[in-house]
Regions:
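The beta1-alpha1 cofactor-binding region of Rossmann-like NAD(H)/NADP(H)-dependent oxidoreductases
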Residues: 20-34, 63
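A short, exposed helix-loop element centered on a Lys and neighboring polar residues
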Residues: 81-82, 126
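Active-site-adjacent segment of SDR/Rossmann-fold oxidoreductases
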Residues: 106, 122, 127-137, 183-185
Length: 249
């Protein structure tokens, strides 16, 4: 597949190389970045998009299926990003995109391994957006929806990746990727793209309840409805906190 993509890019007038190392090892990840630096002189943009599926209900899931999904999605993204990170920090420029999924952000039956790995992308992004802020390294996450070969590995799901449904074509995800890879990219944000629609999701926290030092289970039970009420809530992230501190410094 890598060679096919290289050929497509070359035929379109671009320049590309293929590296077939596994992202699931630090050695493989480092070789990917080393090859890119050797061929192009640097790394400006990293899109962590390697992925597999091993779908089963949690009761029936073999832990080997858990491990391999974590290795490719979560560890693989972490390894390649770690290899590229010093390059970007040194030149004070970089754009990183983690590919997440609504299966992790919102949940989906039979994808505990995949969902956990994909939600982990948001955790990495949240931290690296803070660490890269002063170095102009911007880090975001994308949850795409498209008709791809990966989706075709789900039992019972039929796709035609060579001739996808026009409204589920991967090219409808591309504008979001280009935005996150551009000089004008935001940072620390999660975007959703697919079917011609683009949106953003975020973490919110409600006002909370103040009880003091004598709080008990019964107190929480009595106020349970108020505790879970999100009608009055505020977007919250470590990045927002740091940005506010910088404004007030």
């Amino acid at each position: 597949m890598a060679d096919i993509v290289v050929e497509e890019i070359t035929q379109a007038g671009g320049t590309a190389i293929a590296n077939k190392a596994s992202v699931a090892t630090m050695e493989g990840a480092q070789s990917i970045i080393d090859d890119a630096v050797s061929a192009f002189g640097t790394v400006d943009i990293l899109i962590n998009n390697a992925g597999i599926l091993r779908d089963k209900s949690f009761k029936n899931m073999d832990m080997a299926d858990w491990d391999i999904v974590m290795d490719v999605h979560l560890n693989g993204s972490g390894y390649v990003t770690r290899a590229a990170w010093p390059v970007m920090l040194e030149k004070r420029y970089g754009r990183i995109v983690f590919t997440s999924s609504t299966s992790g952000i919102f949940g989906n039956f039979g994808q505990a391994n995949y969902g956990a790995a994909k939600m982990g992308m948001l955790g990495i992004m949240n931290v690296l957006a803070i660490e890269g802020l002063s170095k102009n390294v911007r880090v975001n996450t994308l949850a795409p929806a498209a008709e791809t070969r990966l989706i075709g590995t789900i039992p019972g799901v039929e796709v035609n990746p060579d001739n996808p449904d026009p409204m589920r074509h991967p090219k409808l995800v591309t504008p979001a990727v280009v935005l996150m890879a551009s000089e004008d990219a935001p940072t620390g944000m999660t975007f959703h793209a697919g079917n011609g629609k683009f949106s953003r999701s975020a973490t919110f926290i409600n006002e909370g309840l103040e009880f003091g030092a004598d709080v008990s289970y019964e107190d929480l039970l009595d106020k349970k409805d108020e505790l879970i009420d999100m009608s009055s809530s505020t977007e919250m992230s470590g990045l927002i906190r740091v940005q506010n501190q910088m404004k007030n410094a």
